[in-house]
Amino acid sequence: FIDGNDKAVSIHSPQEAQKLGISTVYQEITLCPNLSVAENMYIGRSNKIYQNWKKMNEDADKILQNLDIPAKASQQLASCSIAVQQMVAIARAVDMDCKVLILDEPTSSLDEQEVEKLFGLMRDLKARGVGIIFVTHFLDQVYEVCDKITVMRDGSLVGEYAIKDLPRVQLVSKMLGKELDDLSDIKGDQPTEQKSESEEPLFETKDL
């Protein structure tokens, strides 16, 4: 549902998606590192054409401050950390009246502190009414920030579940397509360490 509209739509381009209020931030940063933060926020947007650089930077700084993003509009994007670059991409989406934000593996290149900063921004956006689709393979993060889990396997939908109703072991079971008993068998089949009581070498090499 977007603004109460439950009708299926056919989307053929990113521009069409953006008009519907759907924006995506990809795993690989798709911004221009040689441009400023503000330029990246407004580039390619016909509804945001600035003739005044000062005004553009002021507007961008307001958005960055409002979202508590530690960056200046005038600084070069390349000088920002990967986490901040992703936040700038999110700020761009929010300023485009984004109602649904798709985050594709946003934490894959971040350290723990950067992940927490990103999660703080995600929680803030959630409080503002922005729906977030968080694509990740880090299960700990799923249980930390998500309300629902959608499981897909081999390109097909397995199901959608509330976080509180799906223990982690059951999630793994659904992801792998195996019953819980099968998972127990797999765990039990792990090789155990074996030690020889004999002092005779089992393997030797010389003159390598």
PLM features per residue range, with description:
Residues 1-208:
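Glycine-rich phosphate-binding loops of nucleotide-dependent enzymes
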